[in-house]
Amino acid sequence: MRIALGGFRIESCTFSPLLTREQDFQVLRGSPLLASYPFRSQYGDVEFVPLVEAAALPGGPVEKSFYERCKGEFLQGLQEQGPWDGVFLRMHGAVNVAGMDDAEGDLLAAIREAVGPAALIAASYDLHGNVSQRVMDCIDVLSAYRTAPHVDGAETIERACSLLVRCIREKIRPHKVFIPVPILLPGEKTSTEWEPAASLYRLIPGLIKGDAVLDASILIGYVWADEPRSTASVIALGTARDQVHHAAVTLAQRFWNVRHEFQFGVTAAPVDRCIHEALDAPERPVVISDSGDNPTAGGAGDVPYVLERMQALGVTDGVFASITDPEAAAICETAGPGAEVDLLLGGKLDPVHGKPLRVQGRVRSLCQQPWLLHRTGDAGVVNHMAVVDVQGIQVIITERRTPFHRLADFRNLGIEPRQHKIVVVKIGYLEPELKALAAKALLALSPGAVNQDITSLPFKRIQRPLVPFDPDMAWSPVAIGCGRKPQESRNARS
C-alpha cells in the first residue's frame, strides 16, 4: 500500500491588508515531512511517501504564485512517483488565495484528476475550516478537530490517516453526508471549553458505530473570510447510508437548536473597561486577550491600541505580548541591553486598524530564537526579539509574527508572567497554559482585522440568510449528496 503525504495549511483572514508570502510559510519535504508522522511505524505494510507540505501562521490571503508552485510540486510528485492507493493531506480548511475562492477545492480537484477515481483521498481539518461542495465531491475521508483550543491536533491527524488506511485495506469507499449549517460565529464564542459547544462535541463518539458510521465532524467554520463557502458544517461518513444520514442530521439539528446560546466564555468588554477591571482586581496576574489583533486568528499582530490604552490608564506593572515590528526589533538589537530607545512601534503591517505608537523605554533583554511554526520544521530562520521596559510595562517586540501561548515563550525572554499584575496577549480564547496562569481572564474587544464584532464587518460575499446576521431565520437540516459514489464493504449494514 502506497500513500502520498502533503498538505497546505493556513487560516486566511480576508479583512487583513497583509499578503501571506512564501517567506511566511514553513515547507516540509522528504524525511522532515515523514518524521512529522510518528505513528506511521504501526503500519508496517504501508509505504508513506512524503511529497510537500506548506504551513503558515494565520494571516491574510496567500500570494497566488506561491500556492500554484506548491500545488504544481505536489502534482508533479504524484505523477512521477505513482501509482497510489491513497493520498493523505494535513489541511486547515480556511485557505484564501488572492484572486481565488476555495483553494482547498481547487487543490483537491487537481489531486483527484491526477490520481484517478480508484485512489482514496483523506484529510485532517481544523474545526475552523470552511468546507465546500467541491471538496466533498473530491475527498473520501475528512475528519476535523474536536477541541478548541486545539489540543487534539495530533490525535485528529492520526485518526484521519488511520481511517484512510482502514478504508484502503477493507476496500471501503465511504458514503458521505455533508450538511452546511447557516451559522457563522467566532471561535471565542464556540470554544469546547464551555457550553454549548462542549456538549455538542460530546455527541460525536456516541454516533460512531464501526464501519456503519466511521467518523463524524462538526466544523464551526472560519468567520473572518468573506467567501460564499463561509459557514459551519457537519460531515458524517461510513458504509451504512441511513445511519450516516442519521448521524449528520442529528449533529446538525442539535447545532441549530443551540445557535443562540453561544457566548464568550469569559468577561468580554471594551479595552478600557478590561484594563480598569484588571487594575482593580485583588488577584494577579490578570490575563487580557487583545482579541481583535490576534495573529493566531489572522490578525497582523502589530496594532498597538491596547498598549496605548495601558499607558494612558496608568499601568505600571504589566507585560504586553507582543508587537511585530522588524524595524523596532533591529533598533533594540543595535542599541543593546540597558540602552534607552525611542521607537515608533507597530501600525505598519496593518495601518487600517492602527497607527504607529511612539514609546520610550529601556532595552531589558534581547533574544534570537529559531522561528518554528508549531515548533516543528526547519530551524534555519531566526526570529529576533526584544523586551523593552516602557514605564513598567514589559513590551515584547518580535521580528516575525509570533504567538505567545506557553509560559516558556515568556521565560525565554527573561519574563516570569506570574510576577506581573497584568499580562496582555494577542490571542482570543486562552490556550491551556495561559488559562492555568490567569487568576482572572478578560477578553478585550479591541480593534483589528479579526474584530469580534462580526456583524459590523464589511461582508459582501457570504451567503445569506446566516446566523447571527439573520437571527430569526428558519432552517432545517438538508443533507447534500457528494460526487463520489459510495462503495459498501462486505460487512456493511443499511
Question: Where in the sequence are the language-model features?
Answer:
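Hard-cation-handling environments
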Residues: 188-391, 396-400
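Cap/lid and interdomain-hinge subdomains that line or gate substrate/regulatory clefts
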Residues: 48, 58, 122, 129-223, ...
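N-terminal amphipathic/basic leader segments beginning at the initiator methionine
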Residues: 1-43, 52
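Low-complexity, highly charged intrinsically disordered N-terminal segments
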Residues: 46-49, 53-58, 62-77
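Glycine-rich phosphate/diphosphate-binding loops that line cofactor/substrate pockets in enzymes
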Residues: 1, 43, 76-85, 274-286
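Extended hydrophobic packing segments that form well-structured cores
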Residues: 50, 72, 256, 370-493
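Active-site histidine-anchored catalytic micro-motif
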Residues: 4, 8-11, 64-71, 81-172, ...
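Short acidic, glycine/serine/threonine-rich loops at helix termini
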Residues: 15-19, 62, 99-101, 132-137, ...
